[in-house]
């Protein structure tokens, strides 16, 4: 089965996610998180991509990205995951023992309106949702912590947002998403479908060839001929 197409056009917004192979831990200690953030900084120097929000968890990571050239997101994350894999194996002496990541990263386009804020909140409250902290801003390995630290700790990773940040942003992040918002984000993660209003989603799906992501996966159900008139 062919891999689904990936949208990666300059100046568009995207959510990206990857996990450890079989959901295994890829950040075992604080030094691992620090090392990955240094890799991110190196990648930003090499490839035209901006980090708007992110969160690193023990076995996966989330990013909200804005490439500044076509293909910038894919090139950036491909280099980051490859470099992280190489350095992880070198550090832990695990070369030849299997993959670090489950595969290539997953992504979906985000509409640059209130839908962007929903995804940013989803990302920045990931550790809070997992009950690892009492407040979202307490999680050291993410953009909210960095945004609240002035100046931003080295290495510098964050770019200015293309939309003005909503007032009382920290409190907004600490408030749970509505069930509708949460399920909509999770569906876009699962399918790789654009996240926005219906008209925008249909337009972007046609533009990037993502129509298949809007359809339920799996084989269509076969109706029982005995019940065809019921």
What are these regions (language model features)?
Residues 1-57, 66-230:
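Short Pro-Cys-Gly-centered "Cys-loop" motif that presents a nucleophilic cysteine in a tight turn
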């Amino acid at each position: 089965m062919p891999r689904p197409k990936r949208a990666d056009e300059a100046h568009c917004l995207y959510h990206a996610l990857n996990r450890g192979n079989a959901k295994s831990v890829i950040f075992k200690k604080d030094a691992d998180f620090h090392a990955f953030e240094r890799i991110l900084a190196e990648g930003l120097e090499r490839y035209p991509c901006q980090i708007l929000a992110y969160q690193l968890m023990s076995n996966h990571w989330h990013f909200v990205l804005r490439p500044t050239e076509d293909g910038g997101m894919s090139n950036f994350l491909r280099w980051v995951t490859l470099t992280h894999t190489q350095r992880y194996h070198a550090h832990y002496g695990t070369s030849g023992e299997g993959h670090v990541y489950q595969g290539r990263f997953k992504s979906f386009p985000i509409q640059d309106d209130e839908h962007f804020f929903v995804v940013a909140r989803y990302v920045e409250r990931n550790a809070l949702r997992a009950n690892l902290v009492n407040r979202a801003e307490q999680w050291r390995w993410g953009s909210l912590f960095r945004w609240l630290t002035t100046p931003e700790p080295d290495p510098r990773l964050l770019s200015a947002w293309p939309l003005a940040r909503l007032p009382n942003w920290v409190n907004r992040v600490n408030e749970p998403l509505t069930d509708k918002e949460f399920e909509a984000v999770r569906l876009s993660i699962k399918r790789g479908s654009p996240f926005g209003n219906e008209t925008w989603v249909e337009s972007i799906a046609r533009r990037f060839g993502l129509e298949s992501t809007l359809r339920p996966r799996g084989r269509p159900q076969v109706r029982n001929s005995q019940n065809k008139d019921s």
